[in-house]
Amino acid sequence: LGDAYAPFSVTDDPNRPTFQVPNIGLADEAETRRLSDRIALRKSLDTLERAFDREGELGALDEFEAQAATLLTNPQTRDAFDLSKEDAATRDRYGRNRWGQQLLLARRLVEAGVEIITSNLTGPLCGRVNNWDDHAVNQHQFEALRFRMPTYDRAFSALIEDIYARGLDKRVL
């Protein structure tokens, strides 16, 4: 699909109290105006560069810049990443762990209009292996799955229930 469709990755643990997504939102209206001025200036300066762009790579750059501007200027984007706006019962229902809060974040992003979300459930919750591929250390599968499966079941069932309760089932595959 090209670079313009590369994912925006969130690598921090959404269950951490200090969770935040870097470079989301601007502090005030003055910063938003300055960003708009910079974008306009850059567009006026890159006309010569476009004349020599035979590969069309600047089109992908334009898409990146539009996405970045949206991330910086749209308060709905910043709010979607703010899990403190969820009540404690909802956060508990998903599970107060990395996986549960990732899936809660996925639901919030769908509500904010994000069309494609991938949640990568790896990390320390997987036991001795950092992913779901246990065949290399299969003597520990039961131990790992005994922990993983209830955690996964809790988070994923909460996501499915929320998707239907909020009427998102027509937009989520």
Residue ranges and their predicted role:
Residues 1-173:
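Ligand-binding pockets and gating/stacking loops
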